[in-house]
Amino acid sequence: MAKHATPKLDQLESGPWPSFVSDIKQEAAYRAANPKGLDYQVPVDCPEDLLGVLELSYDEGETHWKHGGIVGVFGYGGGVIGRYCDQPEKFPGVAHFHTVRVAQPSGKYYSADYLRQLCDIWDLRGSGLTNMHGSTGDIVLLGTQTPQLEEIFFELTHNLNTDLGGSGSNLRTPESCLGKSRCEFACYDSQAACYELTMEYQDELHRPAFPYKFKFKFDACPNGCVASIARSDFSVIGTWKDDIKIDAEAVKAYVAGEFKPNAGAHSGRDWGKFDIEAEVVNRCPSKCMKWDGSKLSIDNKECVRCMHCINTMPRALHIGDERGASILCGAKAPILDGAQMGSLLVPFVAAEEPFDEIKEVVEKIWDWWMEEGKNRERLGETMKRLSFQKLLEVTEIAPVPQHVKEPRTNPYIFFKEEEVPGGWDRDITEYRKRHLR
């Protein structure tokens, strides 16, 4: 019999989708049975108390978690999020319920043996509940107590060769897509870039010194499988400078129905005959494509790299050969100033190891943001407050048309002194020689 009645949570198990409630109940039953005979280092009933406190929150319409100060491991300023329940007598199993963030490998490649060892640590020293993965990309280990933190950290670092992730006002754990290891559209090695910058900026990751969090995300192509354009302060997205490659015969094969569009995805129902006009040409956001009945043409200078045509006809269209990445800045979720998408800063960078060109931009941004950013102000909010123009100045990047968001509406142009010949100072005598009273 369950420790707590949870009628509201039970409803969440009734839908067609997998339920986190079922997962927690399964873990509660496993811990109660204890088939491995473990000497649990945290209360055996912590998953049941977790359900109980959540049911109470549903009943009362308010949270019963509090942020009870700073907990962590020696020498690190991040990686552990301290959480305490404000009803410890009712739910002693979750009186302390700290979260441990564990750095994921580039591309999130794991061996079964590694995952088994990780879960063995967490079964013994935590609740057994995990989240694979958090929105930053970390492995999230949900629920342990303060005395176990150093023990967990020791086992992760000494036995699994794994580090903690980032939390607090620091660099969060960089995240990348699968990149060149699996994807035919990869324009640069996103996994290598992610690893290189992770190792380069260990201090920034573990010792908070920023106004607020800062996230790197690396997408190897414009499909954006880690959504860097929407979820990271510094987004590196693969792109190409030359033309999309067209296989004219393969285009005709798609039109004739010989090849399935979208590489066979969405084939669970009959969508009718493939219509290249409706499904490709008319869906191009910049209207840079034309089909004359026998030939597909692309005005590449108008292409915005949306990837729709390439995804729809991958055997006929392919990314160009002059490949690299674009750098965008300022994306974030709606905390203080509303959600923001990334703004293009560097239209094209070669993105080759050791990625020094990317590091130069990063460090100039940090120098400015750490000086000018307010407490708990993301980079995107600093950009909005002090202007994108200021960001261009501090990064020493020349303005280009791609930086323009929209035509300006202010008729006044404000020049800087260095932009005016002779500056602000004028010799009145010389002026009167040219302009009589």
UniProtKB/Swiss-Prot annotation:
Binding annotation for [4Fe-4S] cluster 1: C177, C183, C221, C225
Residues at which [4Fe-4S] cluster 2 binds: C284, C303, C306, C309
InterPro entries linked: 4Fe4S_Fe-S-bd (IPR017896), DsrA (IPR011806), Nit/Sulf_reduc_fer-like_dom_sf (IPR036136), NO2/SO3_Rdtase_4Fe4S_dom (IPR006067), NO2/SO3_Rdtase_4Fe4S_prot (IPR045169), NO2/SO3_Rdtase_4Fe4S_sf (IPR045854)
Keywords for this protein: 4Fe-4S, Iron, Iron-sulfur, Metal-binding
GO molecular function, one term: sulfite reductase activity
Record's keyword annotation contains Secreted: no
Entry GO terms, CC: sulfite reductase complex (NADPH)
Domain 4Fe-4S ferredoxin-type residue range list: 294-322
Subunit: Heterohexamer of two alpha, two beta and two gamma subunits.
Alphabetical list of NCBIfam families matching this protein: dsrA
Descriptive protein name: Sulfite reductase, dissimilatory-type subunit alpha
Originating species: Nitratidesulfovibrio vulgaris (strain ATCC 29579 / DSM 644 / CCUG 34227 / NCIMB 8303 / VKM B-1760 / Hildenborough)
